[in-house]
Amino acid sequence: MSTGVRPGRRFTVGRSEDATHPDTIRAAISEFIATAIFVFAAEGSVLSLGKMYHDMSTAGGLVAVALAHALALAVAVAVAVNISGGHVNPAVTFGALVGGRVSLVRAVLYWVAQLLGAVAATLLLRLATGGMRPPGFALASGVGDWHAVLLEAVMTFGLMYAYYATVIDPKRGHVGTIAPLAVGFLLGANVLAGGPFDGAGMNPARVFGPALVGWRWRHHWVYWLGPFLGAGLAGLVYEYLVIPSADAAVPHAHQPLAPEDY
């Protein structure tokens, strides 16, 4: 079964019939569920901390939220990587798109699925907590919009670079088995680094769900522009400067395992 992921270095729009291909539909459903799993646990950890403590701006609270994000993303990537590639993030999908690893048609379907998954998870979280309003993301005092854009771009560059190295690179070898942990742990580390400044979004879907359900839109554009810039640059750098030209057209890890591999 093909997931429709293409060799790199060739931007492709894709065919209209790709949107209704069973493999594409399965991949989009996988992205929806994986993103919902991630956002529910990630935003839930923030709500839980706020429920227990009046002041969440403590070092212990930051570590707890970072760990929750790391574990949630690791699981979300693991459950989706053999079906859709385990993007779980519109910025990661964009990085794969500019590197020629997914078609535009598939990318658009992934984006829709990821955003819907994030909204569904946040709605379920609000219902399950008796109507608690998701806090979402905000810039700390003294942090300007463009400072946050730069921070988001740098953090998401690292996230996308790690994804390329452990999931997409044709020569990733056995390192591919730790891809979910590698990506998850880096996300957690970035939450520790950037959380006190802008919440450390790195994922437009992760930010969009709470923004819509909690109706908090201030500085929202920052959490789209920064991650897309960082992920797009990482995709170009890894695709053109790291992967040898001879390996660029080699199919990669977004193929499901054969039954005997389970």
Curated annotation (Swiss-Prot):
Pfam family, one: MIP
One GO MF term: water channel activity
Residue intervals passing through the bilayer: 27-47, 61-81, 104-124, 148-168, 175-195, 223-243
Gene3D superfamilies given in the database record: Glycerol uptake facilitator protein
GO CC annotations, alphabetized: membrane; protein storage vacuole membrane
Motif (NPA 2): 203-205
Paired cysteines (S-S): none
Top-level taxonomic group: Eukaryota
Function description: Aquaporins facilitate the transport of water and small neutral solutes across cell membranes.
Family under the similarity heading: Belongs to the MIP/aquaporin (TC 1.A.8) family. TIP (TC 1.A.8.10) subfamily.
Protein name listed in UniProt: Aquaporin TIP3-1
Taxonomic source organism: Zea mays
